[in-house]
Each structure stands twice: as C-alpha cells, then as structure tokens.
Amino acid sequence: MDMRRLVGRNVRRIRERRGLTQERFAEISGFSQQYISGLEQGRRNPTIVTIYELAAALGVGHMDLVQPDEEQGA
C-alpha cells in the first residue's frame, strides 16, 4: 500500500474514533483543515516530523500512523 494512503487512512480512522471533525483536529494539531483533508485522501506526503506532530495531536504513537490497521487486514 502507498504510504501516503496508509497514513491518511490511519489519521482518519483515529480522528473519527476520537470523535473529532477535521476542523477540530486542525485546531488541535496546528495544521489547516485543507491539509488534513488532503492528507486523509492520500494527496499529501507528510514528513517524519509531521507524522510525529499529527500523532501527538491524536494522542497516539507515531507508529500508529504508519502501520497497517489490523482490523482491515491490510
């Protein structure tokens, strides 16, 4: 799987489990809603620093954003 898509899917899955809208997550993370949207659609190529910052804003470890979701069997 493409790493951009994987990170985007994981961000969306975790964000939704936390009950956060893209707008609220943007406020918490410091990234724009447009960036979050593009990221979740697999159109952004986040740096490792960005992955750490997104993970911190979601309250998870950075590895949670780069590993396939076991529930999806990916």
Spans of model-derived segments:
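Alpha-helical residues within the helix-turn-helix
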Residues: 16, 27, 56
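The DNA-contacting recognition helix of HTH DNA-binding domains
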Residues: 22, 33, 43-44, 62
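A short, Lys/Arg-rich alpha-helix, primarily the initiator
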Residues: 1-17
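Short alpha-helical DNA-recognition segment
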Residues: 20-38
